From Swiss-Prot:
Origin species: Saccharolobus islandicus (strain M.14.25 / Kamchatka #1)
Principal subcellular localization: cytoplasm
Subunit and partners: Homodimer.
One GO BP: prolyl-tRNA aminoacylation
Function text: Catalyzes the attachment of proline to tRNA(Pro) in a two-step reaction: proline is first activated by ATP to form Pro-AMP and then transferred to the acceptor end of tRNA(Pro).
Catalytic activity from the UniProt record: tRNA(Pro) + L-proline + ATP = L-prolyl-tRNA(Pro) + AMP + diphosphate
EC numbers on record: 6.1.1.15
Family assignment from sequence similarity: Belongs to the class-II aminoacyl-tRNA synthetase family. ProS type 3 subfamily.
Protein name per Swiss-Prot or TrEMBL: Proline--tRNA ligase
HAMAP family in the cross-refs: Pro_tRNA_synth_type3
Matches recorded under SUPFAM superfamilies: C-terminal domain of ProRS (SSF64586), Class II aaRS ABD-related (SSF52954), Class II aaRS and biotin synthetases (SSF55681)
Length: 481
């Protein structure tokens, strides 16, 4: 086996569909509703592991988990007019109960700012109760009219983590935005997923937000995918829903809010970014199975049984040390067939144990990411596997960051930017004066989408690619999902 990444990069869509199906992560396209898939047991365990990282980081920073109803009345959803305009073409509506028409249409939750603010209005009365941080992990529904894609563009987003916070002042809410950004950085670092962090321009903010900050990553085909967003909502939703609190000075005022979300796309990025032509390479931090033991049969039945017994013993040693391990005891498949199966599942480490290892009380270790191998004594296997898992995690992270950085280009000419994007460059940064008019023109001329501009100050000694005035920053442009 050699490491190749041709199919992974040049035919990514086919590669991704193949991995989800053959790796038994997610069955998509066969459930009889467009844009909805089924999490299979192996993929569901990966999903659980990723959710666990998210949940632990939120819980440890004072967030409290809640669970809201799926249905939102139309009159409530429309209370924040900018918000509903941003979603009205994407809402699924329930219009009947049994055979009777409903008096008020009910929306399948597209997001929960309005619903949660409604209840916060009942629960929170004073600055003494603030800050308040809620979150839930639920399904949301969007009536996508574009071509749907498994995990990437869905009508039911099954893993939507949405956090909603309430604060006395604008500055308090801004500090929460900064905390949320740091939480997301930790999440993506745990997943070994690289990103660029941008502030979305005014014409592409979340509906009803004052500011939107987005995490984007570059997929194998050069297209960019949004993997997380953080929104400073100001008083827009509290004002629309007449939600007031008593402030420290005794006055009543609308509190300031934030919201931030992560979806199935984070899981898609974990599967996609660390892959090769043989399948995904799951980071050990979230891999459902960290080690697979593949017994190599002996020339006789008795020898094969002894190899199997030794293989099971090694696997039990690892499991007792909290290293998730399985032994592939399928007698109908050859070792080569088993290698194929576990490679497409992205298991980080394979142990091969045959008569030679049995006779010498050793174990043969094979890394999935770079194919390096080691032979270690039985008593050393636990420590060596732990060491190798840590190395794989760090190497995947480094490789992914290096790849992302290599796919960010700078162009001070609009034609150059367009050509780079047409050749799957990834992200192109162009000098920009800061005006909406020029930003929209950049989108039009490059036939791409503006991601936003860096949140840190970026001095640009150049001219805007459109108006030729002095540039204030760079604008990031990409082909996107």
């Amino acid at each position: 086996m050699q490491i190749t990444r041709e199919k992974w990069s040049k035919n990514f869509s086919e590669w991704f569909d193949w991995v989800l199906r053959e790796g038994e992560f997610y069955d998509y396209g066969r459930y009889p509703v467009k844009g909805m898939g089924v999490w299979m047991p192996y993929g569901f365990k990966l999903r659980q592991n990723i959710i666990s990282i998210i949940r632990n980081l939120l819980d440890s920073t004072g967030h409290e988990e809640v669970l809201f109803p799926l249905l939102i009345p139309e009159d409530l959803l429309s209370r924040e007019s900018t918000h509903i305009k941003g979603f009205e073409e994407e809402v699924f509506w329930v219009t009947k109960g049994g055979s009777e028409d409903l008096d008020v249409k009910l929306a399948l939750r597209p997001t929960s700012e309005v619903a949660i603010t409604t209840m916060e209005n009942l629960w929170l009365k004073s600055y003494k109760q603030l800050p308040k941080k809620y979150y839930q992990i639920v399904s949301v529904f969007r009536y996508e009219t574009k071509a749907t894609r498994p995990m990437i563009r869905l009508r039911e987003i099954t893993t939507f983590k949405e956090a909603h916070t309430v604060h006395e002042t604008y500055d308090d809410a801004q500090r929460q935005v900064e905390e949320a950004i740091e939480i997301y950085k930790k999440i993506f670092n745990n997943l070994a997923i690289p990103y660029v962090l941008s502030e979305r321009p005014e014409w592409d903010r979340f509906a009803g937000a004052l500011h939107t900050y987005a995490f984007d990553t570059i997929m194998p085909d050069g297209k960019v995918m949004q993997i997380g967003t953080v929104h400073h909502l100001g008083q827009n939703f509290s004002r629309a829903l007449d939600f007031k609190i008593q402030k420290k000075d005794g006055s009543l005022d609308y509190p300031h809010q934030t919201s931030y979300g992560i979806s199935d796309r984070a899981i898609a990025s974990v599967i996609a970014i660390h892959g090769d032509d043989h399948g995904p390479i799951l980071p050990p931090s979230v891999a459902p199975i960290k080690v697979v033991v593949v017994p190599i049969p002996a020339k006789n039945e008795e020898g094969t049984q002894q190899v199997m017994k030794y293989s099971v013993e090694i696997c039990e040693m690892l499991n007792k040390n909290n290293i998730t391990c399985v032994t592939d005891q399928d007698t109908e498949k050859t070792p080569g067939e088993k290698f194929y199966i576990w490679e497409i599942k992205g298991v980080p480490i394979r142990l091969e144990i045959g008569p030679r290892e049995l006779a010498s009380s050793t174990v043969f270790i094979k890394r999935r990411d770079n194919l390096k191998s080691y032979t270690v004594k039985k008593e050393e296997v636990v420590n060596k596997v732990k060491e190798v898992l840590n190395e794989i995690q760090e190497d995947l992270r480094k490789r992914a960051w290096e790849s992302l950085k290599s796919r960010i280009e700078y162009a001070n000419d609009i034609e150059k930017a367009k050509n780079l994007l047409e050749n799957n460059s990834g992200i192109v940064e162009v000098p920009w004066c800061g005006s909406k008019e020029c930003g929209l023109k950049i989108e039009e001329l490059t036939n791409a989408r503006v991601l936003g501009y860096p949140i840190e100050d970026r001095k640009v000694n150049d001219k805007c690619v459109i108006c030729k005035m002095n540039a204030k920053t760079v604008l990031r442009v990409a082909k996107t999902y």
